Amino acid sequence: MTADELVFFVNGKKVVEKNADPETTLLAYLRRKLGLRGTKLGCGEGGCGACTVMLSKYDRLQDKIIHFSANACLAPICTLHHVAVTTVEGIGSTKTRLHPVQERIAKSHGSQCGFCTPGIVMSMYTLLRNQPEPTVEEIEDAFQGNLCRCTGYRPILQGFRTFAKNGGCCGGNGNNPNCCMNQKKDHTVTLSPSLFNPEEFMPLDPTQEPIFPPELLRLKDVPPKQLRFEGERVTWIQASTLKELLDLKAQHPEAKLVVGNTEIGIEMKFKNQLFPMIICPAWIPELNAVEHGPEGISFGAACALSSVEKTLLEAVAKLPTQKTEVFRGVLEQLRWFAGKQVKSVASLGGNIITASPISDLNPVFMASGTKLTIVSRGTRRTVPMDHTFFPSYRKTLLGPEEILLSIEIPYSREDEFFSAFKQASRREDDIAKVTCGMRVLFQPGSMQVKELALCYGGMADRTISALKTTQKQLSKFWNEKLLQDVCAGLAEELSLSPDAPGGMIEFRRTLTLSFFFKFYLTVLKKLGKDSKDKCGKLDPTYTSATLLFQKDPPANIQLFQEVPNGQSKEDTVGRPLPHLAAAMQASGEAVYCDDIPRYENELFLRLVTSTRAHAKIKSIDVSEAQKVPGFVCFLSADDIPGSNETGLFNDETVFAKDTVTCVGHIIGAVVADTPEHAERAAHVVKVTYEDLPAIITIEDAIKNNSFYGSELKIEKGDLKKGFSEADNVVSGELYIGGQDHFYLETHCTIAIPKGEEGEMELFVSTQNAMKTQSFVAKMLGVPVNRILVRVKRMGGGFGGKETRSTLVSVAVALAAYKTGHPVRCMLDRNEDMLITGGRHPFLARYKVGFMKTGTIVALEVDHYSNAGNSRDLSHSIMERALFHMDNCYKIPNIRGTGRLCKTNLSSNTAFRGFGGPQALFIAENWMSEVAVTCGLPAEEVRWKNMYKEGDLTHFNQRLEGFSVPRCWDECLKSSQYYARKSEVDKFNKENCWKKRGLCIIPTKFGISFTVPFLNQAGALIHVYTDGSVLVSHGGTEMGQGLHTKMVQVASKALKIPISKIYISETSTNTVPNSSPTAASVSTDIYGQAVYEACQTILKRLEPFKKKNPDGSWEDWVMAAYQDRVSLSTTGFYRTPNLGYSFETNSGNAFHYFTYGVACSEVEIDCLTGDHKNLRTDIVMDVGSSLNPAIDIGQVEGAFVQGLGLFTLEELHYSPEGSLHTRGPSTYKIPAFGSIPTEFRVSLLRDCPNKKAIYASKAVGEPPLFLGASVFFAIKDAIRAARAQHTNNNTKELFRLDSPATPEKIRNACVDKFTTLCVTGAPGNCKPWSLRV
C-alpha cells in the first residue's frame, strides 16, 4: 500500500515529506533534515523541556486556531499533518531582530550555559501567544515542564515577570507599585543599581507575530481523510472517523493507539519495545467531544489533559461548590501532573488505559465513580471505573478490539465530600510515590457514613481500593473513633513487601494514613458549624493540615556595589554585563557540539556497556547487530592501535577486555550510518558473563577492606587531652548521598580523521581539552601534537566533564581512525547518568568534645567516600574534604582521616565543590548537635567557635581577610533573623501538623587546585590591523561566564571597548597544556594570563602612542604593524606560594578563601514530608566583583544546586549495582517552583581581594554549600515536630542523612501514624535499592 505525504509547516515554510517514518521524532527531523538546531535534546523523555516548540493547528470542534507547547523529543512527525511548528529560530534572531522574549531572558541574565534557554523561550512565547498579558502565576506555571541546571531560575522568572499585568518587575528601580521589593516590609535594604533596566526592553506587540499558514486555514472545511505512513519497522495509520478506527482495531487488535506519544514513545525508546502497527485517533470528533450531562461532564478519550483542565476550571467557576468536589480533586492532581508540554498532547483516555500503578488520576476516577464508555465494532458498554477495572499490572478490562470512547466525571452530590492527594519527590512535574482519591457520602442530614471510597496508586501493582477498611465504616459516624479504625485498617490492608519496587516502604504506608487524616480533617472543616454532636470538632492547630499548597508572591533582591563615580563607560569591570553569548543562546544560534552540521559520510557511534557490576566477559556476539540496516562495525579492545589503558592513573580501560567492574562499564561500541541504527545494533549485541562478587556500598567496602591507597590524615593539637577536658562528648554517624551533574547537554564528541600522519580533529564538550588530547593520542599510539581538540562551549559541566568526557572521546576517536570517516556520539541522558558517575557519597563517623558553654575543644572525623571502580579524582576530592572539615570554626585539637572506598559502581568524579560540601555538611551537623546538647541557640554556638582574622586553620594556613564575621552580621541583619525566629516559634505553637524552621550557616572555601602544578594558565592574543582583538585562553566556557569576564579583563587592560574583542573557542593548538576548567580558579588564573598578554601588547604599542598621543587604538596598531612589530603574544601565570605537605601539616593548600553566609526558612508538612522554601538571604564575599550579574548568577545557581544536593536529588541503586535513576522522570533536580519564594542575594561591599585579578574572587563553587542552610532549617522544623510528640524533649539528638527528601522528613516526624507503619525487613530480603 502506498504511503501518504506528510504536510506541515515549520516557521512559516511548507514541508512535504514523502517518506515519513513513524519512529522519527520532530526533534530529530528539525535538527537533521531541516538544520534547525536551536531545539535541543536534553533527555529524550519529555522531562527537561530543552526541546520545547510551539504547535499550532485549526481546532474543528472549537472553530479556532490553537497554540500549545510540546516536547519535540516525544512528538512523532506523523502527528504533525496540517500542523504549524514554530521553533526558537522562527521567532527572532541576532541577524534580524530578537523577539521580546529572547531579548528579556538575555538581558535579565537568565541564560548561563544556554542549553535550556531555547526551550524556556518557547514555553514563554507559547504562553504569550495565548495570553499576551499573563499573570505572574501563569508565567510560573508555564515552566513546570522546563529545567535549568545553571541559573537557579530567579533571573529567568524576574525577566519574564516584566510581561505580567500584575506585579511586572521593574528590575529593582522601585518605580512599580507592584514591585516584588515592596511586597515585604524591610527597611534594611540599600538598593543597588539594577542588574537590568526594563525600560530598555522592546514592547511586546501581539499583532507582529507570524500568522497561521493560510494554506492550512483554507483546509479547515475539507473533511480529513485516513492517512498511512510506512517506516522501516512501523506502520502508522491516522484514522479520521470512529468507524474507521473500530474497523482498524478489529483488523489489528494488537495495534497501539497513540495520541500524544508520551507513554508509548518512552517504551519504544527506553524499554526497546517495538509496536509494528500504530493507530492515531486524535482527529476523531467523538473522541474529542466534551458534553455536560445531567450526572457529570463527559470527555472524549482523546481530549488533551490541558483541555480537560480548562473545562473543569470553567465548571468550578460556574457551578455550585457542592457539585464540583470531584472536579476540584481532579484539578489538584492535574495541577502537578506534568508540564504544559505534556498536558497539551497527552490524552485523558491514554492516561487511564496506560494503567500505571502510580497514576495520578486513576485513583481519583476510581474513588469518584467515574463511568467509562467502551466500544468496539458492533458493541458499546458503559462500566464504572471501580476496583475490578485493573485486573493486574498494566492491564484493564478492555478486550483486544475495544477502545475507550469517553470518560464521564461525575458531579458531587449533597452531603458528599471528595479530596485528592499526591506525594512525590518534587512538587512540580514528578511521578507520584503515593497518590489517592477519597470520597465520603453521608446519610442525608447526618454525619453517618453512607459510602466511603479510599483508592490509592503506588501501593500495589495497580490502582487499588481499600475495600476491607471502607466497608467496615459504613453507618459509622465521622469522628475520632472512625479515624482510628480507618488508620488501623489501612495499615493492615495496604501492606507492602520489603522488596516492593520503588522502595520507601514505611514512607508509602504512612502516606496512606496521612492522606486519610488530611481528608478526615478537610471534611470536618467543610462541615464547620453544621457538625453534629457525634461528629468530631476540628482542633484549631490542625487547620493548616487541610490547606493545599499555595504559591506565595515572589520577592527577589540582588545587592551589589556599584562602580566608582568617574569610571569610564568603556570600562565594564564591575558592571552587570550580560553573558556575551546570551542573545545567541536565546535565539538558538549558539553552537554546541552536536549542533555542528553533519559531515559528508559521517557515521554514528553507540556504546555497548556492561549489565553486571563485576564479572568476567565470557563472549561477545555481534551477529544480530550485523543484521541491523546501516551497521558498519563493532569496536572492542582488540581494535585499539595504541594503549587500552586510560584514566588519570592508568587504572581504567577504553574498552573492558576480560573483566567488567561496574554496570555501565564500556565493553565496546557499534558504528552505523544513523544514530537510530547504531542504537538498535548496540542493543542486540549479546555479552555473556561469569559473575564475580561485587562491592556496592561504603559499608561493603569497609567490611571487605576494599580501599584505594592508604589513609589520608590531618591532625593538629592533642586529641586525647582535648576529649579528656571536654564537659560533653557526642559521637555519631552521618551519610550524604551522591549527586548527578545533570548538565543539560550530555557528553558529546565529533572526531574527524585528517588522513595524514595520524592527525585527528575533535570537537568535544569537555572541561579538559588537554587530557582529551593526551588520552586520545595514547589510545591511537600517536604523538600528542597530531591531535587537535576544540571546545566552543558546553551546555553545563559542573565537574562532570573534567575527566569523564574522555570515556566518550577515546571511543569516538577510535571509530574515526578505524573507519576513516567522521564519527559522532552524543550520549542519551540514561546512558550519561549510568556511565559517567557523579558526586561522591560520603559516610562520616565523628566524635566531638565541647564545654557546657558550647566551645568545641576536640574533634575527630573519619571520612569514607564511595570512589567507584577507578581512582579518577577521588584522592584530591578527599584531600579537599579534609581541608574543609572545620568549616569556619577554630578547633584546637582535631584529627580528620579519609579513605577511598573501591566499589563496583561507575567511577565517581569531580562535582562543583569537589568534596568540600560533604565535609562542610558533616561539620554543620555536629555543630548543630553541640548546640542542642548544650541547650543553646545554634547561631550562638556557631558564632562562639568562629575563627578570627589571623587565626591558623587545622592545616596551619593563616586566614587573611577573614570576612565571615562581616557576612554573618550583615546576614543576621538583612534576614531579620531574631524577629523571624520568634515568628517561627509562634507559628510552631499554633500549628500541629506544619512546622517551620530557620537556620543560618557560614562557609569558607579554599581557592586553588590542591595539586600545585595545575595552578598555571596560558593565554594568546592576536591584534589585527583593523584594531580588533582575538583572545584565546586555556579555559572553557560552560555557562559560568568565563569568556565574558576574560573579554572584560582584556578590555580594561587594553582600554578598548569590549566590542573590539572576541573569543572564539578553546583549542589545544592555541593554548597548549591547559589545566582543566575547574576548582573555581579559571577567572583568577586565565584572567591574570590575559592581563599579562595585554601588558606585553601595550608595551609594544607604547612607542607609537608616544609618537601619536592623539591617535586612536587603530592608529597605533597600524603603525606597529607597519613598523614590523609583532601584534601577537602569549601570557602566562602561575599561582605563587602553594604547596601543602600532609606529612608535616605545613605549607599553603590555597591561595585564598571565598566566604559567605546564608539564612533560610522553610515550612514542612509533617504528614507528607513535603516542604516549602520560604526565604533565603545570602551574603557573599566575592571581592570586587568583575561582573555582579554573572557573580550573583553563580551564587544563586550554586545555591540551588546545593539545595538539590541536600533536599531533593537522590540516586537509587539496585543491590546488584544497577542505577535505577537514569533520567528526569526518576531523578529530580530543583525546578522553578523549588527555589525560595523570597530569594535575596547581597555581594559584600568594600572587600577587595589583593590576590586575584582586579581584586576579584572566585565564585563558582563556594556558594553551593549554603544550600545546606535549607537542610538544617528542615531539621530545625522536624525537631519542633518531634518535640511536640515527645513531651517537649528539645535536647533529643536524631540522625537525618542527606538529602532531606519527603521520605526522610516524614519518617523523622515520628507520630501516631508512623508507629502504625513500622516495617521490619526479613534478613533474606533484597531491598529495591541500597544506600551506596
UniProtKB/Swiss-Prot annotation:
Keyword hit for Flavoprotein: yes
Note on cofactor: Binds 2 [2Fe-2S] clusters per subunit. Binds 1 Mo-molybdopterin (Mo-MPT) cofactor per subunit.
SUPFAM superfamilies: 2Fe-2S ferredoxin-like, CO dehydrogenase flavoprotein C-terminal domain-like, CO dehydrogenase ISP C-domain like, CO dehydrogenase molybdoprotein N-domain-like, FAD-binding/transporter-associated domain-like, Molybdenum cofactor-binding domain
Entry EC number(s): 1.17.1.4, 1.17.3.2
Positions of [2Fe-2S] cluster 2 binding: 113, 116, 148, 150
Chain residues that bind substrate: 802, 880, 914, 1010
Key words of the record: 2Fe-2S, Cytoplasm, Disulfide bond, FAD, Flavoprotein, Iron, Iron-sulfur, Metal-binding, Molybdenum, NAD, Oxidoreductase, Peroxisome, Secreted
Pfam families named in the record: Ald_Xan_dh_C, CO_deh_flav_C, FAD_binding_5, Fer2, Fer2_2, MoCoBD_1, MoCoBD_2
Annotated residues for binding of [2Fe-2S] cluster 1: 43, 48, 51, 73
InterPro entries cross-referenced by the UniProt entry: 2Fe-2S-bd, 2Fe-2S-bd_dom_sf, 2Fe-2S_ferredoxin-like_sf, 2Fe-2S_ferredoxin-type, 2Fe2S_fd_BS, Ald_Oxase/Xan_DH_a/b, Ald_Oxase/Xan_DH_a/b_sf, Ald_Oxase/xanthine_DH-like
Disulfide links within the chain: 535-992
UniProt GO molecular function: 2 iron, 2 sulfur cluster binding; FAD binding; flavin adenine dinucleotide binding; iron ion binding; molybdenum ion binding; molybdopterin cofactor binding; protein homodimerization activity; xanthine dehydrogenase activity
GO biological process: xanthine catabolic process
Family, per entry: Belongs to the xanthine dehydrogenase family.
Subunit comment: Homodimer. Interacts with BTN1A1.
Record's protein name: Xanthine dehydrogenase/oxidase
Organism for this UniProt entry: Bos taurus
Gene behind this protein: XDH
